[in-house]
Amino acid sequence: MKLSEISDNPGARKKRMRIGRGIGSGKGKTGGRGGKGQTARSGVRIKGFEGGQMPLHRRLPKRGFNNIFRLEFAEINLDRLQDAIDAKTIDAGAVINAESLVAAGVLRRSRDGVRLLGRGELKAKLTIEVHGATKSAIEAVEKAGGSVKILAPKKDEGEAA
């Protein structure tokens, strides 16, 4: 047996069907697309068209608005912080802020700031600087002997006072 003699088992690889190559091919003329018209054409589909019936996006009323001042915080729970400290990803002695969390890979990005949530237990004494925190999170950090400093949201930092 040589490398040049190795081949697939018969029927292991099926030949692809070439469409539009004559009636005798079994997939000629219309090529499996039915008759002529819009549906026979390439990629033509009217989005949301329901055959003349009033489409859903026009049947339902408009609702709400997009607040351009909305702030979106990246959220982190105490148990995630404790896991990162246990794994030595974060130094418990240093100040923990948005930049250090992103640099350590605990958060992917900090968006408009970081908000600390109170799920889980915290054993380490931490100094945390975040843009928002729940009461339970602040209590848990202070109970462990640490402190939480609330910063102004990132969007406000760039504005003139």
Curated annotation (Swiss-Prot):
Residues 21-37 have a biased composition (Gly residues). Keywords: Ribonucleoprotein, Ribosomal protein, RNA-binding, rRNA-binding. Part of the 50S ribosomal subunit. The gene is rplO. This is Large ribosomal subunit protein uL15. One of its GO terms (cellular component) is cytosolic large ribosomal subunit. The keyword Magnesium does not apply. Binds to the 23S rRNA. Pfam families: Ribosomal_L27A (PF00828). Transmembrane segments: none annotated. Residues 1-43 are annotated as: Disordered. Belongs to the universal ribosomal protein uL15 family. GO terms for molecular function: rRNA binding; structural constituent of ribosome. The lineage of its organism: Bacteria, Pseudomonadati, Pseudomonadota, Alphaproteobacteria, Hyphomicrobiales. GO terms for biological process: translation. PANTHER family: 50S RIBOSOMAL PROTEIN L15, LARGE RIBOSOMAL SUBUNIT PROTEIN UL15M.
